[in-house]
Amino acid sequence: MAQSIEAILAELKRGVENIYSEEDLIAKLKENRPLRIKLGADPTAPDIHLGHTVVINKLRQFQQLGHEVIFLIGDFTGMVGDPSGKNTTRPPLTREDVLRNAETYKQQLFKILDPNKTRVVFNSAWLNELGTEGMIRLTSNYTVARMLERDDFKKRFTNNQPIAIHEFIYPLLQGYDSVALQADVELGGTDQTFNLLVGRELQKSAEQKPQVAITLPLLVGLDGEKKMSKSLGNYIGVTEAPNEMFGKVMSISDELMWDWYNLLSFRPLAEITQLKADVDAGKNPRDVKILLAKEIITRFHSEAEADLAEQHFINRFQKGAIPDEMPEFCFNGEIGLATLLKEAGLVASTSEAIRSAQQGGVKIDGQKIDDVRANAQLGTFVYQVGKRKFARVTVK
């Protein structure tokens, strides 16, 4: 039995921040044809983390509803550099960097999307053909005043920080992608709102029906404060080992867990609502977090590896009598392990930290560490000294 437009819309709105506009989306859905859904990414790094997958999951949802899914790799725009959310000019990448990163992107992408039903395109195919005349026509669609309405540009202009001309051009190039593809819908994070709306306006100028712009929240990272980012060290890469992924998911706060369920889980909303009710009724949130960790690991590895990671976690943590409650600390920037142990109150001095490690009394996530003279690793881990001293520490 076919779903009603209302039911489909309710499903598509899950986890969404804004739709520009919902009326346009309803009208397109009523056309009863496969819509052309666009998601673009500049491959600025070789690996995808869970934060990137929020919009990819939404793309998968459209794919499962029978729509035409286009994943656009910005091999041209990646060499320009997206200024979205940046306080300084992003350094451009070489074409070799972009193409190398694009290959690993595709491999990781198809852990979520059906490769046989996904069209992968490169925007150099049409942007290289623009030429000088085409670029001048494109830039004539927008004014500097309109560009300065954008928050990140406005802040930099107000603070007398430089804005390069090519950064003004970037949103126009991304918008032109939508014209070239005749996109019906474009997906992006909330930091992409301006760029997506430029696409709508350029399509109107090209006498196309404007795309619907759907924005999704940025996933909060392991620290529970800032968006997931490699530079902040609060991320989980989709290629990380199952045991590492499991431990990191289990380290997030109980409050953050529900946001992750909403943005990362494929479970029906009714099931998530029931899990929340179970926790409110007294169920240990750790057990619900285990379900989330296993779901994520199954997606990027396998169900068997998820089961092994769970057992590994139980053996290292629960059987090792690591408590659920412990002091939590957060340090910014580089910090030596010995200093970290001292600042977290696990030892009285750095010399005691060194001595305890040499005697086998220091553990990080259950693993013995015999040398604490190195710097602490970025991320959130459980640090233990002796049998009874524990602290959950985030270094970012």
From Swiss-Prot:
Location(s) in or outside the cell? Cytoplasm
EC annotation from Swiss-Prot or TrEMBL: 6.1.1.1
Superkingdom, taxonomy of origin: Bacteria
Entry keywords, A to Z: Aminoacyl-tRNA synthetase, ATP-binding, Cytoplasm, Ligase, Nucleotide-binding, Protein biosynthesis, RNA-binding
| Motif 'HIGH' region per UniProt: ranges | 43-52
Q: Which Pfam families match?
A: S4, tRNA-synt_1b
Per the UniProt entry, the disulfide pairs are none
Its Gene Ontology molecular function terms? ATP binding; RNA binding; tyrosine-tRNA ligase activity
Q: What does this protein do?
A: Catalyzes the attachment of tyrosine to tRNA(Tyr) in a two-step reaction: tyrosine is first activated by ATP to form Tyr-AMP and then transferred to the acceptor end of tRNA(Tyr).
What is the official name of this protein in its record? Tyrosine--tRNA ligase
Q: Does the keyword Lyase apply?
A: no
- Name the source organism: Haemophilus ducreyi (strain 35000HP / ATCC 700724)
Q: Which reaction does it catalyse?
A: tRNA(Tyr) + L-tyrosine + ATP = L-tyrosyl-tRNA(Tyr) + AMP + diphosphate + H(+)
